Amino acid sequence: MIKKEEVEKIAGLAYLKLSDEERETFTRQLGDILDYVEKLNELDTDGVVPTAYTVPMKNVLRDDKVGSSIPREEALDNAPDKKDGLFRVPSIIGE
């Protein structure tokens, strides 16, 4: 069973602030997940060939083709913030 302290550490590593209710919920949910993984570890997989894909692989991507798109002004009509004909978005990287 996972401890509340371990959930707090995981939340800290993910930069998450959890309420007491969320901490309780995640402690229970992570405990359930770890219990399920433990059950999976009990499966006899002798003779089962390891594989990364369960279905045959084939290239499902299409060739890149240049096509028409909507005019810039029309795209910017939907933008909550714009400047000099460009989308304006919040900075996510510090200077």
From Swiss-Prot:
<dbReference type="GO" id="GO:0050567">
    <property type="term" value="F:glutaminyl-tRNA synthase (glutamine-hydrolyzing) activity"/>
</dbReference>
<comment type="subunit">
    <text>Heterotrimer of A, B and C subunits.</text>
</comment>
<comment type="function">
    <text>Allows the formation of correctly charged Asn-tRNA(Asn) or Gln-tRNA(Gln) through the transamidation of misacylated Asp-tRNA(Asn) or Glu-tRNA(Gln) in organisms which lack either or both of asparaginyl-tRNA or glutaminyl-tRNA synthetases. The reaction takes place in the presence of glutamine and ATP through an activated phospho-Asp-tRNA(Asn) or phospho-Glu-tRNA(Gln).</text>
</comment>
<dbReference type="InterPro" id="IPR003837">
    <property type="entry name" value="GatC"/>
</dbReference>
<dbReference type="GO" id="GO:0050566">
    <property type="term" value="F:asparaginyl-tRNA synthase (glutamine-hydrolyzing) activity"/>
</dbReference>
<protein>
    <recommendedName>
        <fullName>Aspartyl/glutamyl-tRNA(Asn/Gln) amidotransferase subunit C</fullName>
        <ecNumber>6.3.5.-</ecNumber>
    </recommendedName>
</protein>
<dbReference type="GO" id="GO:0070681">
    <property type="term" value="P:glutaminyl-tRNAGln biosynthesis via transamidation"/>
</dbReference>
<dbReference type="GO" id="GO:0006450">
    <property type="term" value="P:regulation of translational fidelity"/>
</dbReference>
<dbReference type="InterPro" id="IPR036113">
    <property type="entry name" value="Asp/Glu-ADT_sf_sub_c"/>
</dbReference>
<keyword id="KW-0436">Ligase</keyword>
<keyword id="KW-0067">ATP-binding</keyword>
<dbReference type="Pfam" id="PF02686">
    <property type="entry name" value="GatC"/>
</dbReference>
<dbReference type="GO" id="GO:0005524">
    <property type="term" value="F:ATP binding"/>
</dbReference>
<keyword id="KW-0547">Nucleotide-binding</keyword>
<dbReference type="GO" id="GO:0006412">
    <property type="term" value="P:translation"/>
</dbReference>
<comment type="similarity">
    <text>Belongs to the GatC family.</text>
</comment>
<keyword id="KW-0648">Protein biosynthesis</keyword>
